[in-house]
Amino acid sequence: WIQRHNELTALTAAGVSRTRVITPIVAAAIAISLSTCLGRELIIPQLAKKLDRDPKNLGGEAGQELKPRFDNETGILMQGVYTFANEQRIQQPSFVLPETLDQYGKQLGAESAYYRPPEGDRPGGYLFKKVLRPSQLTEKPSLKLDGRAVVMTPHDAPWLQSDECFVISNINFDQLTGGRSWRQFSSTAQLIAGLSNPSLGLAGEYGADVRVAIHARVVQPLLDLTLLFLGLPLVLSGANRNVFVAIGLCGIVCTAFMMVVLGCQYLGEISLLEPALAAWAPLMIFVPVAVGLFDRIEY
């Protein structure tokens, strides 16, 4: 707009360099980018549970269908009919036990199961109430994997009621019910912690998408600035005084930029590129271009 109305000409005639003209724009872009990062890392994780819920079920009272989830550490397939977020409860849970834990039966079923976070010496997991399957499970010793209890029974855990059992798992309720959305609303620190969680099975190529997301978050402020410096020369150069032409060119640049960014990230998620390279490759491509274009306005 200042180019179309010759305001830039007046500023340069007064001895104000174009670099000085764009300094407030760059400063504002940096402030916006940093505030976005702070919101993503500090605010959104606090609101993750509400953001992940259906608008018609913000309180979490209505049941949501539970998609089966595999615990890669214990080998248990976690299934159920519905989940209730307000109670962190699974209705009619039916966990399928692996061969290493099926001494009493293949399925572990109950009327309800409640997630309990780690507390004191007790690890986190799911408290089954009114156990239905296997029969007489509550009277038998706990099921162990490599010497570590996985399915605890009242026989070895006095804090359990006579019709209860406790399944130890490092998959919390949000990770069980959220699917991929927990990655979207989690902070970078939570994503890094998820990579080291054996229950989630994100080691190796299975966690490539999470690794790409972590690197992408780190590089995002730099991508924002790169895109800004790609667009500024198109607006401030003397070649385009028509604001609509400048808008069109900026739209084309933004489209090409986003296609490259998303394309590289996709290749990283399917393990055709290393996660770090997938996130940083757009910078390697566009930073030299942005530096070259910046020479057009630095006079």
What label would you give each PLM region?
Residues 27-146:
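Non-transmembrane, extracytosolic/lumenal segments of membrane-associated proteins
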Residues 12-17, 271:
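Short helix-to-coil transition segments within interhelical loops
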Residues 1-9, 14:
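Transmembrane helix boundary and interhelical loop/hinge segments in multi-pass membrane proteins
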Residues 33, 253-262:
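Aromatic-anchored segments of alpha-helical transmembrane domains
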Residues 287-299:
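A juxtamembrane structural motif centered on a specific transmembrane helix
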Residues 49-69, 115-252, 268-273, 298-299:
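Non-cytosolic (extracellular/periplasmic/ER-lumenal) segments of integral membrane proteins
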Residues 276-289:
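Small-residue-rich transmembrane alpha-helices that serve as helix-helix interface/gating elements
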Residues 4, 43, 230-231, 260-263:
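Hydrophobic/aromatic residues in alpha-helical transmembrane segments
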